Amino acid sequence: MPHRYFTTEIADGTATLRGADAHHLARVMRGKLGDTVILCDGNAVEYTAVITGFGPETVEFSVEPGYPSAAEPSVEVTLFAGYPKQDKLEQVIRHGVELGCAHFVPFFSRYCVAAPKKEEQKNERYNRIAFEAAKQCGRGILPDVALPLPNFGAVCRSLEGYDLVLFCYECGGAPLRELLANVRPADGKKPKIAVITGAEGGFAAEEAEMAAQAGAKTVGLGPRKKM
């Protein structure tokens, strides 16, 4: 299977790869003239590309016409994730990318154990993790990670424009399958779904009420079953 790389420098049948990925292809993978790779523009369009040249910090390609990436889900998912303790947000982002999330919005809430600290520096690292995960699992877009929201009220004020908002509540709710049954594309656009998950401490009752007032649908995964 050809290696995959992201680049926005694709036009008129040619493309350029720069930076760490160019170094990886040229030095680590020892790419040669005529080798074929897959390039993705980060907007779910992929290109079959043939290496035509190497510069000091670039790799040049000729590319065939683009085609839609088959790796993207039929919905656009934003994950609002309660900020977990230690480095667990890295795992949330990595696995969320693998599962098809397009956007990540961490937030602090009543029962979060973690506290804000050097969030701008962390955000750079989180976006790098999302980028690497997208490359590794063959995504057609570059998922992004926002700076964390300071409280749950800020989350609720961010929920306009979604076709469906799912509030994952430990006290139960409607079956997920039922809530997703009527989600359909409209006017050729992907449905936009927001999923809200809590940190280790879950949600306060008043936060659940705020979510409902903001239009969120409370969802549960059903009762635990004994093995």
Give the residues covered by each predicted segment:
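Residue-level signal for inorganic ion chemistry
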Residues: 34, 96, 130, 211, ...
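Structural motif
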Residues: 4, 36-37, 59, 76-78, ...
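N-terminal positively charged helical leader segments and presequences
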Residues: 1-68
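A mid-sequence, solvent-exposed acidic-amphipathic segment
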Residues: 148-186, 192-193
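A C-terminal functional module that forms or caps the active site or interfaces directly
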Residues: 190-210
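Short, ordered loop/turn segments at secondary-structure junctions
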Residues: 66, 108-112, 200, 223-224
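RNA substrate-binding interface of SAM-dependent RNA methyltransferases
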Residues: 70-167
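Structured adenosyl-cofactor binding patch, chiefly the S-adenosyl-L-methionine
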Residues: 205-227
